[in-house]
A protein has these predicted regions:
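Intrinsically disordered, low-complexity, positively biased terminal segments
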Residues: 1-39, 154, 158-160, 171-178, ...
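A conserved beta-strand-loop-helix scaffold within acyl/acetyltransferase catalytic domains
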Residues: 2-4, 34-46, 53, 58-168
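Active-site/acyl-donor-binding loops of N-acyltransferases
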Residues: 2-14, 37-61, 193-263
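Surface-exposed alpha-helical segments enriched in charged/polar residues
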Residues: 20-23, 75, 120, 181, ...
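Short glycine/proline-enriched coil/turn segments at helix->beta-strand junctions
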Residues: 25-28, 125-128, 189-191
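Short, surface-exposed, polar/charged, turn-prone segments marking secondary-structure boundaries
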Residues: 78-82, 112-116, 161, 181-183, ...
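Aromatic (often tryptophan-rich) hydrophobic motifs at membrane interfaces
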Residues: 129-233
């Protein structure tokens, strides 16, 4: 369980099929069940759409599910761009480097900055996996994943190429697709079974949201519905949730990491 200190309470996040420890041993006020396959009875529940790629399939079947244009760009990057794939074994050692890179990307696109507290807590629990596509000594794209059981979920994706010339933008676009592909290969070799694309937007009314969804669909994942469930674990947590609901009626919440990404 990932423990997160809030303003007045301690949250505990459990992902996918994870179960929290018994309340007497959890040490948290509120339990957040993330990406559950089924809703938790009597919980505050919201739905979240996502896409998932089956990593138990052979590599040729996985890449064969990519849309043709995506598959072409991955193969071109493999053959001509001189990219290097790096997976950071101890994510905590490179957390600031990743977050600084992401924040530069986020400022270009007017997105929320990286949630360093969340990232650091995930790293402490050994569930954070960082990866990077390099060309020479220059990082082109960074990804951050959350690992839970046999599933790995994309949490952040960042590439900084806005304002650059078109050839460089095309290179970074290929590198991003290539990095996703090599991330999947890495996780498959590590014995994971499912690559979750970190959510898709139900509302595609803006070009930005439609573009992110379209990018993820290029990889041919299967559409799934997740449930985000919130359960108080202490009287303090129950009171705080009631106050939080009143506050959110006036101020929209900060988005969960699932959708803090860009294509």
């Amino acid at each position: 369980m990932i423990r997160l200190e809030g303003r007045a309470v301690i949250y505990g996040e459990v992902w996918f099929d994870e179960e929290p420890p018994p309340p007497a041993h959890a040490g948290v006020d509120i339990i957040e069940y993330r990406c559950r396959p089924n809703p938790i009875p009597n919980a505050r529940t919201a739905t979240l759409l996502s896409l998932q790629t089956d990593l138990t399939a052979p590599p040729e079947a996985i890449v064969g599910g990519f849309h043709g244009g995506c598959r072409y760009l991955v193969r071109r990057a493999e053959a001509k761009d001189g990219l290097r794939h790096e997976v950071i074994r101890d994510a905590g050692d490179c957390l600031d480097e990743f977050a600084d890179f992401y924040d530069g990307f986020a400022r270009q696109k007017a997105l929320w900055l990286a949630d360093r507290h969340w990232l650091s807590r995930v790293a402490v629990e050994g569930q954070l996996v960082l990866s990077c596509a390099w060309r020479g000594s220059k990082p082109l794209v960074w990804h951050a994943h959350l690992r839970s059981g046999r599933t790995v979920r994309l949490a952040y994706s960042a590439s900084c190429f806005r304002g650059m010339e078109s050839g460089y933008r095309s290179l970074v676009g290929r590198a991003n697709r290539w990095l996703h592909w090599h991330d999947m290969l890495h996780f498959k070799e590590a014995g994971l079974e499912c690559y979750d694309w970190g959510g898709v937007f139900a509302d595609e009314s803006t070009p930005e949201r439609a573009g992110i969804n379209q990018f993820k669909r290029m990889f041919g994942g299967q559409r799934v519905v997740h449930y985000e469930c919130t359960v108080p674990a202490t009287p303090r947590g129950r009171l705080w949730l009631a106050l939080r609901e009143r506050r959110r009626a006036w101020h929209p919440p900060r988005p969960v990491p699932a959708l803090r990404q860009g294509a």
